Amino acid sequence: MVRATGTRMGLLLPIILALAIGSSAAGISSNDPCYFEGKPRKCLPSFVNAAYGNPVQASSVCGAQQPERYCELLRDGNAGECRSCEQQRYGPAALTDLNNPSNVTCWRSGAVNVPHDPDSAPPDNVTLTLSLGKKYELTYISLSFCPRSPRPDSLAIFKSSDFGQTWQPFQFYSSQCQKFYGRPDRAKISKFNEQEARCINSQHDTGGAAQRFAFNTLEGRPSANDLDSSLVLQDWVTATDIRVVFHRLELPPQLLKVKNANAFSDEMGGSREEDEDDDADLELDGEQDEYDYNLQDNDSADAGYDEYEEPKKHLELDDDHLHLDYASDGESVVKRQGKHKGSAYEKHYQSKLAATTPPQQPPKVTPPGKVTPPSTAAPSAAASAVTLPISQHYAVSDFAVGGRCKCNGHASECVATVSSGSGTALSDQDDGQDEDTPSAPSLANHFGRSTQMSAKLTMTCACKHNTAGPECERCKPFYFDRPWGRATDNDANECKMCQCNGHARRCRFNLELYKLSGRVSGGVCYNCQHDTTGRYCHYCREGYYRDATKPPNHRKVCKRCDCHPVGSTGKTCNHLSGQCPCKEGVTGLTCNRCARGYQQTRSHVAPCIKVPTNANMIQAESAGGGGGGGTGDYKDGGGSQVEEMKKYCGKCKASPKKLNLNKFCMEDYAILAKVIGHDRASQDISTEKFSIERQNEIYKYEINIQTIFKRNPMSGTTSSLLGRGNMMLLVPRKSIECQCPKIKLNKSYLILGRDSEAAPGYLAIGPSSVVLEWKDEWSLRMKRFQRRARKCS
């Protein structure tokens, strides 16, 4: 039993080793998710936060030029503890670092003036631009806001798929979508507008204060469940860069109430009745202490705010261009004609504060940058209003982008590559980045403090399935036998190698040939080497012919024709047989000798001339024992030879030249073939049924079979193996001399014969064969014979 087991293991060991070597040679790991049991299948990279560790460019940073004062905003709308901010502490690096709820890091923008009339004030245009460094297919975008800070009321999210060259709307948020962005709230998405950006009410159907905005890129899109088949949605979720534009802050009702109360003073010409109405409205708004934001999927549109001649009812957005102007120091700059409408209000507000507020000591600054307001005794209502700031800051703690590295289903991972150079991925889209803001996806520079880049970190798909490119978006060189396609659950669309038989290193794809092949093969080889040509480098070029003794991929499969310069009519030969085109009376593979019945001359025009043939010549040649074709060699006396020849030729010429159904049924095969070459047999061919003892008694003709009208259904016979292409036809010498049949080169013939008259692998002309020069009008008759052949008994 042990011996039997050992024997069995000894037999299995070579198989196991062969499988292991084959798997290793193919470069396919057993744990590769892109293959299953050696067959390709769809694979995807891991789902990641694509924003983590990537640089963010901010148009405004709190304390960028000098330390600024900001105050926390309490839930009741009053100002809380005030602090001093600097860029190093509140820079954009905090947006994509590790988000730790117990130690929240924040980016804060520069001061944004609280407008007198938020509905008519120009937008703030504070921007954040995130470069992902590569194309990703995004699932969500999330913005988490800092505690005790105002939330944005209106913002727009844009995406770029070409590294910041162009921008496309992705999502809008606003409490007044129609008025501010000119778009309806929660517009319905159909299959006809799946790439349309939507606007979501930032205060709609929320319960409690929202700490973030979350946008699901596919939610509500009809083709979301069949992403592989929707080119529109594939383009929709693809992005290399994300830009967030903050247009307006949402302020607590209490803060707006104080500003409105100070603004509509007697000096501004307001009436008591209007003030009472406004106060009543503000009191209604003030009943809400918490502010909620809708967490819905969002789409964006490009925002162009170059000039503001006067306040508009809503912002007009251009979906093709995003016009944003930034100063070189990173502060946002908005071009306007005339003064800001809020500037007059601010001067009035400050003068009113000075008139109603008792003198105070300057605030004391205590570490770490906190600003402590001086204590006052029993402040009045007006004095308490003074503690509220007239400016606020956008504050975001986390900028997350969930998605997968875009690899079109041909890679299971993305790998980081480092290339030398400097500059940013968004060099053409400078958003006024501050000098200390990171400018390339380098983790070391992202958190700190240097702008000099000696290397650039990029992500690239580790492509499988014979694909290449950053997103595996094309077939790798020499794998163009089928078109590139995105991998799906049903088909991995693996790229196939071109079939060039080892004679070419380059190929291209031809769609028409691919369709004609039944969508099997479309590769076309070019620059074929080793004297080959053709789509697959499977033919020999002009002046060469294929050596049948060598495989198609052999470097020397094509041999030079070497046609005789005098005996041949050209330098080219048949690419299969190597037969050169010979002049009249010349024979041989290279046309290097005179045929039987011809004699050599000194003329280059007619190197061989025909010798008159008569009975005496035949008798003399027979008596002399001359061999090798021509009129032949006969053992009987001269008279008997002549009589035998006449008898044979008479029978041949007397045979019927008409074809009928009975004759069609009697033969094993019926073909239409064209004679493309000829040569005398160079060796004996002998079988049990077919024997030729002397090589000068047979002629070989190379024919090209064009149509097969009938073949013997019995397997193993020559006719059962017939197919369109080239084949050898054997013709007896006597038939050639009697011109029965009269065979000419480059002519087509209808040939009917029997398998018993030929050696296996050949066709032969025998006593029962029929050879007729083809006429086009016979096509209908042959089709009729084919239909009626079933009745052959």
From Swiss-Prot:
The keyword Repeat applies. SUPFAM superfamilies: EGF/Laminin, TIMP-like. It is found in: Secreted, Extracellular space, Extracellular matrix; Cytoplasm, Perinuclear region. It comes from the Eukaryota. PANTHER family: NETRIN-A-RELATED, NETRIN/LAMININ-RELATED. Netrins control guidance of CNS commissural axons and peripheral motor axons. Its association with either fra or unc-5 receptors will lead to axon attraction or repulsion, respectively. While short-range repulsion requires both fra and unc-5 receptors, long-range repulsion only requires unc-5. This is Netrin-B. It comes from Drosophila melanogaster.
